């Protein structure tokens, strides 16, 4: 929603208010695990691999470590997004964003199940029972 094709300098960036120095994988997660679009996991990870190959020209990265960082960064980003969507609903009366929570939560569920070191977060999410609230 925040990128568009322009006559030059593609892509055009419409919204960069969260532009910060952060994890190497943050921008990639933002594009490939977007809160508004469902990408097939196979396509997502192929694009991640393509990015990593290009990155490895400048910085040597282990594939499994990069994928882990990609996934964990996604969990952080998606937890933040769910909070923002909830705030937009309750404070700003923009309930349309609630429609994006199930997709966003699904990303989190997938990753906390994928990695054993995420078991405490997985347990907490089950206790909170966000799914039932959706």
For each feature predicted by the language model, list its residue ranges.
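Localized chelating/binding microdomains
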Residues: 3, 51, 98
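Active-site activation/catalytic loop segments of kinase-like enzymes and analogous catalytic loops
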Residues: 21-60, 72-92, 104-111
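Exposed alpha-helical structural elements
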Residues: 27, 46, 65, 117-124
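Histidine/acidic-rich helix-loop-helix segments that form or flank divalent-metal centers
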Residues: 60-68
